[in-house]
Amino acid sequence: QQNFLVYSGGTCNSRGSIEGHFLALTDFKSINKLFLPKWGKEEWPSAPQNIYAQDEKANNLFIFPNDIDTIYSYNQQKGAVYPFLFLDFHGDFLTKDKHPYGPGEDQEMSEIITKRKYIYSHYSFNQASGKLFFKLVGKREDFCSINLKNNVLYSFNRLFDNFMPISYNPFIGSDGKNLYVLVQEKELAEHYQNIKCTYPAIQRLLPALSPDGNSWILLTIEIKE
C-alpha cells in the first residue's frame, strides 16, 4: 500500500483543512494519520511552492509550511511528523498569529508587503549535500542555508560571481547533490557585461546571450559536502 503526505491548504475552515489539520497521510481512499492541528484564522487555501524537501540519506521529507517558523521532518518508517528546527528571526517572521484577518486584511497585508514590515513568505525550499536552502521574501530578501550536521544557519544574497537572480523562486529543484536554478537570458548577459566570469560553463554560454533575450536557462549549482 502506497501512502502519500498531503497538504491541506492551511485554512481554519473545511475548504482548506483536513479534519482540522494541515497535513494528512492518506492512500487517497482513507486518511491514515493527521498532523499539525490548524491554527490562525486564514480562510483562503494556498499552495506554497517548495513546501517539501527530500532527506536523501534517510528517505524522509523536510516540511516548511507557509506562515510557520518551524521546519518539520516526516519520518517515513514511523509514519510521523516531528518538529525539526525552530527558526528565530527575532520577531521579523510573519507567523499565523501576526497575520492580518478580517475586513481590513487586504489593506494590512498590502502594507506589510510594500513596506516590508515582516518576512512574509519563503520560497526555494530544497536540500542538497546535507544542507537545507530557502529564500526569504519581505523584510529580508536573502537566501538561507542550514547545515544539517550542526544546524547552523548561514545567510547570503548572491549565488555566483555576485549574481543575484530576479526570480522570487530561483531554486526550482534538487537531485540531492545539486541545486537547479532558473535564470533569464538577459539577466546573465547584463550581469557579465562588467563582471569577469569565473565559471567555464557560463563562459561558453555568454557569446550567445543577448541583453534583450527572454529565454530561460537552467543552471546546475554543485553543493559540496
Spell out what each predicted region is.
Residues Q1, G9, S46-P65, G102-P103, ...:
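Structural signature of eukaryotic scaffold interfaces centered on beta-propeller domains
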Residues G10-G16, I68-T70, K139-R140, K186-L188:
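Short glycine/acidic-enriched loop and turn motifs that connect beta-strands
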Residues G16-E19, D27, K57, P65-D67, ...:
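Short loop/turn segments that connect beta-strands within the blades of beta-propeller domains
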Residues I18-K29, D69, D142-N151, A208-I223:
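Beta-propeller blade signature
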Residues G20-K78:
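Loop-centered beta-sheet repeat module
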Residues F62-T70, Y118-H122, N126-E141, I146-N151, ...:
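Exposed, low-structure sequence patches enriched in small/polar residues
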Residues V81-I119, L148-G176, L188-E190:
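Conserved blade-ending motifs and adjacent loop-strand segments that build the rim/top face
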Residues D175-E225:
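Blade-level signature of beta-propeller repeat domains, shared across WD40, Kelch, NHL, RCC1
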